[in-house]
Amino acid sequence: MLCLLPVLLLGVGGSPGRAAPVPELLVDIIVSHNLALRQESLEDESYRGEEGILRLRPEIGRELGLEVSMGDVYLRAVSLHEDAEKALERARRVMADRSEPSQPGESARNIVEAFLAHKKMTLEANALLRDYTRSLTPEADERLDREVCRDLMVRLLDDSLRRTHGRLRDALGCFVNTCQGVRSEPCITPENVRFVNTVFGEFVNRAPEGLLEPYDLDRLDPSRASNLPPGWKRAVGSGAARIAGLVEDALGKLDRDGSIQVDPLLFLALIRRESRFDARAISHVGAAGLTQIMPATAEEMGMENVYHPDYFEQAFSLLREERKARREAVAALFSITPENGLQKAARARELMQESLRLRREKKRLFARYRRELREQPSDPRLQPDKAVEYGLAYFSGLLRDQKGDISLALASYNAGPHRVRQYSGIPPYGETVRFRNRVLEFYREYLAKLDNT
C-alpha cells in the first residue's frame, strides 16, 4: 500500500541536487531515536498518536500512502486535546488581562474554571490515547510494520537530501517536517532543531570519514577566503561595496594575527542579517553597529569608549526577573486543584501581572539606551571599520572554537557559546534558528552570484 504523494517530489527551492545513497547508519540512528521519543511521550503524556519508527500520526501516515487505524477513539482524543488547549489559553488570557474585574475574585474564578476544564479534558484525552495505542497491530496499521516504514524512511531521507543539495542538517529538518505534516521553509525550525541536533551529532560522531564525504556538514572551507576571484565583491551588490572593502581590510589583519580565516561572503551575509548594512543599527536589547555587538562583549574584546551605563545592566536584571515571574505564574497555574483553586489562581495572575510590569520597565530602559547611544558617536560599535574588525575577530574565534562548523558558530554569535554547549547544537530559540537560516540563505545567494560572474 506504499504510495508516496507528490509532496515528496517538491523542491524547497531550485532544482533538486544529487545525493549519495542514504546510509544504513543514519537510518538506524533515527529509528533508535524515534522509538526512544515515543516511549518518552507515553511516559510524560505528550503522546498524540505518533507511532512506529517514523513517529507518524495516523493522518500523516495516510497522506504518505500507509494503511492506518484512526477510528472514533483517536478522533475523540484529538478533539478533546484541542478543546483543552483552548481552555488553557482562556486561563492565560485572564492572567495577562490588565483590566480590573467587575467583581472581586472574578478573575481567579475564571482562571480556575478554565484550568480545571483544561485538566479534565486532557486527562480524558490521554486515557483515550492509551486505549488507542494498545489497540494497534502491524496487520491493521502499517506504521508498525518495520520493513514498510524503513523503506519509506529511506525514500523520505533521499528526497530531503536531494531537495537540500546534500546539506545534512537541513535535510534532517525537511525529513522530520514531512513526518509531522509541517510545510516549512527553511527546513530547520525551533520545533525540530532538537531532533536535528541529536541525529546530526550522533551520525557525524559515529560515521567513518568516507561516509561523511558526500554531505554538506556546514563546514568552513579554509581555502575559499584566500582563493576568491578578483570580482568577488560584486556578489554582494554595489550597496555593500564599502562594507566589503572593510571586511577585506579586516581579513588582512586576521591573517597577520594567525587567526582562522573567514570567507568574506559568509561574514557579509552575517552583517546583512544583523544590520542590513546600517552602521547605526541598534537592536531592541542594545546590540549595536554593523555587527550588532553587545556592550559587555565589546568590552571583553578590548573596545574602548563603549557606552555602557549602569541602568543598561538593570534592564537585563529586569529581563531575568520578568522571565522568573512568568515561570512562577505558569507553575502556580498548573498547581491549581479544586481545593486550592482560588488561592493559586490569584497568585498566578499576580505573578503574571508582575511579569508584565517588569517587561514594561525593561522596555523603557532599553528604549532610553537606544536614544542615548545614538548620541554617542565615540562608541566604536557605531564606527564601521571598528565594528567590522572586532566583529570579524569575534566570529573567527567562534569558528575556531566550533571546529569550523558554520551553523554552530552562527548560533554562538547569536545566542552565546554557552547555549550551544547547553543544547549540544543549535539552541531551540526562534531568533537563533531564524538567524542561522537567514545568514546561510544570504551566503548561498552570494555564492550563486559568484559562480555566475
Give each language-model segment a name.
Residues 11, 17-21:
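Boundary at the C-terminal end of the N-terminal hydrophobic targeting segment
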